[in-house]
Amino acid sequence: MAVEKKIKVLMVDDLEVAVMAIEHIVNQQPDMVLYASAANPYDAVKVISREKPDVILLDIQMPKMDGITFLRKIMSQHPVPVIMFSSVAEKGSANAIKALQ
């Protein structure tokens, strides 16, 4: 019997409650696992260099470095599918549009 490979998800968000909520949702999917989380982009770089994620869930607004800046840096070194999100609707919407450009 072949072992099915699960999609490895890395979540980058500074809010622990958001990480816990997404972890619960992702881990309910039979083909996905939230294998790591990082509270900021600098910690995320360490995780990405150690274990290559299949997809990154990335908060747009974080301290130290915002998600858009991190996205630009990481895509040049480690291209990987990224899903961006924000819990701050008004500012997050404008930043999400900027990220798509």
Outline where the language-model segments fall.
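Short hydrophobic/Thr-rich beta-strand motif most characteristic of the beta2 strand and flanking loop
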Residues: 31-39, 47
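Alpha4 helix (beta4-alpha4-beta5 surface) of REC/receiver domains from two-component response regulators
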Residues: 6, 69, 89-101
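Active-site beta3 strand of CheY-like receiver
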Residues: 51-57
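Acidic catalytic/metal-coordinating carboxylates
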Residues: 40-43, 66-69
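Receiver (REC) domain active-site loop signature in two-component systems and cognate sites
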Residues: 62
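Non-catalytic signal-transmission and effector/linker regions of two-component phosphorelay proteins
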Residues: 1-8
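Active-site residues of response regulator receiver
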Residues: 13, 59
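Hydrophobic/aromatic residues positioned on beta-strands within the core alpha/beta folds
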Residues: 85-87
